[in-house]
């Protein structure tokens, strides 16, 4: 999903999410990119205010009838699913095709190399906080399993810490959950 989860400040993350949504929607036209639009249902156990990102997704609607037990409301909308192994390979090919070069180095802080490169792409994951001297970056633990594809839409219950989700992909489905900070 393109909207930020457990992130802040909302003004910035919503703007990033909106721009990302628009770009990824365009990229769905290229089947090799590994991105598809999917109908998404996010379920809640209590009434919700309008989400700050509702105007940035397609076909947003609020559902209050015919919901699974224990749920009183659901947001329905279109968003993208990115199959990361496919997408990252596609991005790397584009990068190389545009003349980009990869250089593998061991870095303990970005300040060590900031003068050597005009652009540094930080995709270090859990090491981000350490490399960027940002003490507010922390890991969030999750668990997933992959199964044969059964449905074509995404289902979410993102109420921390009992997070649960079903994400369809081209050859499998991801079943996941848990959101334990630290």
Regions found by a protein language model. Give the residues of each.
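Active-site substrate-recognition segment that forms the wall
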Residues: 1-2, 34, 124-182
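Flavin (FAD/FMN) cofactor-binding and adjacent substrate-gating region
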Residues: 19-98
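A conserved short coil-to-beta-strand element within the FAD-binding core of flavoproteins
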Residues: 100-115
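Short hydrophobic core segments
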Residues: 115-125
